[in-house]
From Swiss-Prot:
Belongs to the protein kinase superfamily. Ser/Thr protein kinase family. PROSITE patterns: PROTEIN_KINASE_ATP, PROTEIN_KINASE_DOM, PROTEIN_KINASE_ST. This is Probable receptor-like serine/threonine-protein kinase At4g34500. Its EC number is 2.7.11.1. Keywords: ATP-binding, Cell membrane, Kinase, Membrane, Nucleotide-binding, Phosphoprotein, Serine/threonine-protein kinase, Transferase, Transmembrane, Transmembrane helix. PANTHER family: OS01G0323000 PROTEIN, OS03G0227900 PROTEIN. It is an enzyme of class 2 (transferase).
Amino acid sequence: MSDSGGGSHKSSTTKPSVFGLNLYLVIAICSVFILLISLLIFLFVCLNRVSRARRMRVKHSSGSIPLVSKEISEIKTVGKFINSDDSKGKIGNEVVVVVSATSKEATSGFDTLSVASSGDVGTSEAMGWGKWYSLKDLEIATRGFSDDNMIGEGGYGVVYRADFSDGSVAAVKNLLNNKGQAEKEFKVEVEAIGKVRHKNLVGLMGYCADSAQSQRMLVYEYIDNGNLEQWLHGDVGPVSPLTWDIRMKIAIGTAKGLAYLHEGLEPKVVHRDVKSSNILLDKKWNAKVSDFGLAKLLGSETSYVTTRVMGTFGYVSPEYASTGMLNECSDVYSFGVLLMEIITGRSPVDYSRPPGEMNLVDWFKGMVASRRGEEVIDPKIKTSPPPRALKRALLVCLRCIDLDSSKRPKMGQIIHMLEAEDFPFRPEHRSNQERSK
């Protein structure tokens, strides 16, 4: 009885098995096997896609550039023989960009951007905007994008000095790809200033678009004397090297650059971020407007474009800030604030100052209204300007920041105001003549 009971107990506790192996062990082995098979299939598919992509690149062009966006439909490189003393016999990759946006499309924010190629040198220079740089080229020129080569940093990217093997120097902006911002700014700058050449605008030399690394970089001419913000607000000692005449030269140069964008192009370009840090200076204090990442195109038949409010606090015009309606008048307002900054040496908004002086525009208007205009001059200017020159500059500031945007002058008129010796005093001069009669 006891033996049969014991045998019965043994048989009931025996674990299930397959081919003498524990069932759970068999399941584990099968799971690992299935996982390995799935991994092999996945690797095979990936390798197949990479191989197919390589074959397509070789088939179309061994020097093709990765596509930038859906709007940039085609990019080709063309070998161009460079016949110069410095680079005889070299082949350069030139990228030719043709902007094909109607005015309506342009006002909506750079809807179309097509790229074509040309083997003709003259046509390439007339239609194109710069050279294609490989990521490796720029890594070498910037010493691996080292901190020692970093010359600027902002919300949309980091700027590095690039020293190329041929002795040329450039500034490389590595765009930060926050929520696709690099792609947007890349396209905006190409459309805005890709074909523009003006002595008061920073020249765009070329670009780098590396899809594998998700890199978008813009290559500009190198301006070797920093920006206006550094010279106005940096530690330059008790006496600023920016004399009154130099400051007016910078202001006029900036105005000429903006006037070209507004009045010399079709469609016109609204910069949308005019400020002291975006005014670069060379050793002769020539001003060059830079950073077109927020720029908008405005067709001739359109008086404004409605867009999300962007810019820098203190420089943004009140009508744009409140309605989102943008046109060149917004740049004029920003220039007026910039001119105040040049004259006073003060930032547009400075929370370290007393409450009545925090906002530059309000303080400036109050000082001029109370006939204390001579007191607004930057104390770091050693030699004060002639009274007529000061009055002329003050008048330009006030006209640029008129709350009625339609009453603000055009940039071309501003240039005339700043350069014409007798502009602010013509009405007074006429009235004196009338009284003498």
